Amino acid sequence: MKIILANPRGFCAGVDRAISIVELALEIHGAPIYVRHEVVHNRFVVNGLRERGAVFVEELDEVPDGAIVIFSAHGVSQAVRQEAKRRNLKVFDATCPLVTKVHMQVARASRKGTKAILIGHEGHPEVQGTMGQYDNRDGGIFLVENVEDIAKLHLRDDDDLTFMTQTTLSIDDTADVIEALKQKYPNIQGPRKNDICYATTNRQQAVRDLAEQCDLVIVIGSKNSSNSNRLAELANRMGTPAKLLDDANDVDPAWLENVDIIGVTAGASAPEVLVQSVVSRLKELGVDTVEELTGCEENMFFEVPKELRINEAH
């Protein structure tokens, strides 16, 4: 049996930055550091930070007045920001800059009173934060998840209408939704290209390349990770069975029956240490060769907030 590793895989620049912000805040200010929502959607990462003194909460009312709080990579609504200010919380913002870019598009639409349509998954924290940038009662923001949702939209005129997307969606599904939007509202405005981020795009392309060559694709990522779920869906859609798992303990030997080539990739919030532990487990189960696909090189880097950078330099 052979493993082929996808490339690129695992951590993206936004996840790297978010984790660094929590680590540096702990190093400089000491525990506890409060984090609103899991800083990234990965159980291994979150548990590691929790052991070092990070306290993960879902709402700010769980954070004592004046404490340090970090906003997760998924971003937060304006209401959450205002509450943090009112409560005199010291905030470090780990929102991915590519999510912030979408927030700015929504805020611009809100200021102009332009109606906005967000393509995204209902209930996902990124979607909640992005929807929460719109506060103009004269306009409105509407969420669609799929082509079927567009039929339910009853907006009167499309001359003052714009769309944006969650950053971690399926490229293929999103293209279909955008096409349907443009058919229904020919004058709708939107970003020059969709808002799906470079890391999501690159990892989906890598899975395409992988699925063509493999009998099974293993995606390392947590069940609540949007981008990891999309990777597993993509492989399945291409006709290659895919399994989404948290770590090596989840590998089921039964999956490997009649399998010669196993593809392994990781979502943008899954660290390489988990990939290597899965590779080790698969070697125990009979894998004797490991190859790596050549893929596009990623050199994106996002700085941490200045206050954490100054201390880092010392």
From Swiss-Prot:
Where, in this chain's numbering, is isopentenyl diphosphate bound? H41, H74, H124, S225, S226, N227, S269
Q: How is the cofactor bound?
A: Binds 1 [4Fe-4S] cluster per subunit.
Q: InterPro entries per the record?
A: LytB/IspH (IPR003451)
Record-listed E.C. numbers: 1.17.7.4
> Is-annotated flag, keyword Kinase?
no
The first-level EC class reads: oxidoreductase
The active site annotation covers: E126 (proton donor)
* MF GO annotations: 4 iron, 4 sulfur cluster binding; 4-hydroxy-3-methylbut-2-enyl diphosphate reductase activity; metal ion binding
Membrane-spanning intervals of the chain: none
Entry binding sites for [4Fe-4S] cluster: C12, C96, C197
> Which transformation does this protein catalyse, written as a reaction?
isopentenyl diphosphate + 2 oxidized [2Fe-2S]-[ferredoxin] + H2O = (2E)-4-hydroxy-3-methylbut-2-enyl diphosphate + 2 reduced [2Fe-2S]-[ferredoxin] + 2 H(+); dimethylallyl diphosphate + 2 oxidized [2Fe-2S]-[ferredoxin] + H2O = (2E)-4-hydroxy-3-methylbut-2-enyl diphosphate + 2 reduced [2Fe-2S]-[ferredoxin] + 2 H(+)
What does the record list as coiled-coil region(s)? none
> Which residues participate in dimethylallyl diphosphate binding?
H41, H74, H124, S225, S226, N227, S269
State the pathway, as annotated in the record: Isoprenoid biosynthesis; dimethylallyl diphosphate biosynthesis; dimethylallyl diphosphate from (2E)-4-hydroxy-3-methylbutenyl diphosphate: step 1/1; Isoprenoid biosynthesis; isopentenyl diphosphate biosynthesis via DXP pathway; isopentenyl diphosphate from 1-deoxy-D-xylulose 5-phosphate: step 6/6
Pfam families, per the entry: LYTB
In terms of CDD domains, this protein maps to: lytB_ispH
* Positions annotated to bind (2E)-4-hydroxy-3-methylbut-2-enyl diphosphate: H41, H74, H124, T167, S225, S226, N227, S269
Sorted alphabetically, the Gene Ontology BP terms of this entry are: dimethylallyl diphosphate biosynthetic process; isopentenyl diphosphate biosynthetic process, methylerythritol 4-phosphate pathway; terpenoid biosynthetic process
Indicate the family of this protein.
Belongs to the IspH family.
Under HAMAP family, the record lists: IspH (MF_00191)
Q: What does this protein do?
A: Catalyzes the conversion of 1-hydroxy-2-methyl-2-(E)-butenyl 4-diphosphate (HMBPP) into a mixture of isopentenyl diphosphate (IPP) and dimethylallyl diphosphate (DMAPP). Acts in the terminal step of the DOXP/MEP pathway for isoprenoid precursor biosynthesis.
PANTHER family in the record: 4-HYDROXY-3-METHYLBUT-2-ENYL DIPHOSPHATE REDUCTASE (PTHR30426:SF0)
Protein known as: 4-hydroxy-3-methylbut-2-enyl diphosphate reductase
Q: Which gene encodes it?
A: ispH
